[in-house]
Design a protein with these regions (language model features):
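Short secondary-structure boundary/capping elements
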Residues: 27, 51-54, 116
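ATP-binding glycine-rich phosphate-binding loop
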Residues: 39-64
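Broad hydrophobic/π-residue packing in well-ordered secondary structure
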Residues: 24-27, 34-42, 60, 74, ...
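Short, N-terminal intrinsically disordered low-complexity segments that are rich in Pro/Gly
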Residues: 17-25, 48-51, 73, 77-80
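ATP-binding pocket architecture of kinase catalytic cores
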Residues: 65-141
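Juxta-kinase regulatory segment immediately upstream of eukaryotic protein kinase catalytic domains
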Residues: 2-46
Length: 141
């Protein structure tokens, strides 16, 4: 299993300016228990903060008896339900056409997003990997 230091993303990136002091909110234990109880993912073995990707979205790596998952709470302002549903439809279509995407996990009621206390949560099957290296000129083609 990766250590906490392995989950710190130090990759320089282009995009919205976020200073180094920006820290993702955390998902507290109560919210974590409520949201995860909405999924059939087996018994929980370990949960750790996952700090890669956007620092604005709280993420937790959840290891269970059925596998590893990434729980993500959408950042405020990036959580419009219509946009999330659209993004999930795109991911589903890509998956059906055999594109390698982290699969969304459906909740017990068949949804791919959970609305809890006005916040939007998503659960993905966790895939180990590395950030794309776009420094290779051939990759730009």
């Amino acid at each position: 299993m990766a250590t906490d230091s392995d989950n710190i993303d130090r990759t320089p990136r282009l995009g919205p300016l976020v200073d180094d002091t920006t820290v993702a909110e955390e998902i507290d234990g109560r919210d974590l228990a409520i949201v995860l109880s909405r999924y059939d993912i087996g018994s929980i073995e370990r949960i750790v903060d996952y700090r890669k990707g956007s620092r604005r979205a709280a993420k937790m790596l959840v290891r269970t008896s059925k596998g590893s998952y990434l729980l993500k709470r959408r950042a405020a302002g990036r959580d419009d339900q219509n946009q999330v549903v659209f993004a999930h439809a795109v991911q589903h279509t890509l998956s059906q056409h055999r594109f390698p995407v982290a699969g969304l996990v459906e909740s017990l009621d068949g949804n791919t997003l959970i609305d809890h206390d006005g916040r939007t949560y998503e659960l993905f099957r966790f895939i180990h990997g590395h950030r794309f290296d776009n420094s290779n000129p051939a990759a730009a083609e």
